[in-house]
C-alpha cells in the first residue's frame, strides 16, 4: 500500500499530462482546419493539402541517445505560391509528444526547390521552456513532384535546451 501511495501521484500526473497533450493537439489541429476549411471557402482544394507522417532528424550530437525517427501526423495547406500554413503532432527527439502550428514563407525558387523559412510555435521539449510553447523561425527548402514532396529544415542547437539537426519531412497529397 505504501508503494502505491508513493507512485499514485506520478501516475495521475502522467495521465493528466497525456490528456492535456491530446487536448492541446486536438485544439491546434482543429484551429488549423477551421482556418483553412471554414465555410468562407466554397470548396476545399485537395491539391493544395499535403499530409505527412512525421520527420526523420539527423542530429549533430550523435552520442546523446536522441530519437532520430520522429513519427507523427501533420498537414500543410498552400495559400498561394509562397505561403502555406501547417499544424501537427509528432514524437520528438526526447521521446516526448510535440505539437506545432505555423506558416511557411518560401519566396525563392531554384529549379524545383523552394527556399524560405517556416515560423511558428512548438511544444513538448522538456529542456526548452519546461515543455511549454515556444516560437521558432527555421530555414527550410522544399521539393515537390506530383503527389510526393520533401521538406528539409535546419534546426540549430539551442545550448542544452534543444539539440540541432537536419530534419527531413516526407509529405504526400491525395490529388494533383
Regions found by a protein language model. Name each.
Residues 42-89:
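Short glycine/proline- and aromatic-enriched beta-strand/turn motifs that initiate or cap beta-hairpins
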Residues 1-46:
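Cleavable N-terminal export/targeting peptides
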Residues 50, 55-59, 163-176:
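Outer-membrane beta-barrel "beta-signal"
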Residues 60-69, 90-100, 109, 123-134, ...:
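Solvent-exposed loop/turn segments connecting transmembrane beta-strands
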Residues 49, 81-85, 111-113, 143-152, ...:
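Repeated loop/turn-to-beta-strand initiation elements of outer-membrane beta-barrel proteins
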Residues 52-56, 86-90, 116-120, 151-155, ...:
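Transmembrane beta-strands of outer-membrane beta-barrel proteins
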Residues 53, 73-77, 87, 101-106, ...:
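Residues on the lipid-exposed face of transmembrane beta-strands in outer-membrane beta-barrel proteins
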Residues 49, 69-73, 83, 97-101, ...:
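Hydrophobic, lipid-facing positions within transmembrane beta-strands of outer-membrane proteins
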